[in-house]
């Protein structure tokens, strides 16, 4: 299993956006993927505003489960996303994590995942490259 992550890039402070996650089940997978757990290292200046959602999301839970979840560069949000339809070997699905920039400045948001589909990914770090998905974001002053 692999997970990738994207966002709109440069956006105005206070403007809601989604981190878009794509989950791909390996063609060599032993079976379908029914869920994924991500741990998201939320940077300073970003606030997560709710649980993940998407067309193939049957339910999602996060720890802590208090929103908005204010990033500070060390705070980790752990979310388990359950899929409505299992993702077959070689298939993929996507979901969104809603957020809003709260301060001007560039940052990188990194999330980790368990490539075997387990529920205990390692805690992500700023330079994580193995079993992690990262995307830069640049909040700017509105106007």
Report residues per predicted region:
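Exported/extracytosolic protein signature
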Residues: 1-143
């Amino acid at each position: 299993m692999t997970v990738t992550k994207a966002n709109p890039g440069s956006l105005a402070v206070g403007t809601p956006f989604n981190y878009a996650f794509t989950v791909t089940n390996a063609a060599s997978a032993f079976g379908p993927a029914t869920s994924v757990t991500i741990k998201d290292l939320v940077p300073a200046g970003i606030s997560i505003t709710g649980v993940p959602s998407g067309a193939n999301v049957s339910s999602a839970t996060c720890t802590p489960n208090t929103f908005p979840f204010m990033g500070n560069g060390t705070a980790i949000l752990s979310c388990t996303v359950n899929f409505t339809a299992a993702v077959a070997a070689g298939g993929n699905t996507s979901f969104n994590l809603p957020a809003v920039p709260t301060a001007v400045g560039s940052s990188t948001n990194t999330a980790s995942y368990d490539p075997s589909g387990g529920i205990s990914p390692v805690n992500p770090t700023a330079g994580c490259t193995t079993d992690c998905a990262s995307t830069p974001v640049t909040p700017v002053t509105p106007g």
